[in-house]
Amino acid sequence: AVSGSNIETVGFCYRKAFFDNRMVGREVLSNDGYIITTPTDAGKIFCGDLDYVFRTDVMREKEFPIFPGEKFVPELYIWNKIGDEGQLIFFTEKVIYLCEYLEDGYSRNFSFYLKNNPRGFFVFYSSQICRETKLFYKVKYFLRSLQCILYMALRIGK
């Protein structure tokens, strides 16, 4: 059970594990079995993919942007927007999703996705600059935004 708070809960987040039951990411200990944080900070805390469950009414309000000729926008862009609406509860040890990483998947083909979806990545990276508290990450996302602008310019030239 999650103890009450005055902030409205908009979703829950659980862990992923591989088919051999090894947890994806690093172990995070909590006396309560959960923490309340943002999707951006959760990425740094858990260091691995997570499985989100959002309230339907909030999820419907936050649509993924659509860019002609592109097929991808990082999901964290929307997860952050949902998190802006209320609290997200992250269960530190509860696994609800078993997974495997495929050779042709997003994690192993990041550069391909970035080059082919520069506007989708640009909206994500540019929004992350304001969300980050540490200068290192602000600079990282600023540079990634510039990289997206370069890829957009190269696509226009084709």
Language-model regions, residue ranges each:
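Conserved nucleotide-sugar donor-binding catalytic segment
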Residues: C13-S107
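C-terminal subregions of glycosyltransferases and related glycan-biosynthesis enzymes
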Residues: L76-N80, D84, I89-K158
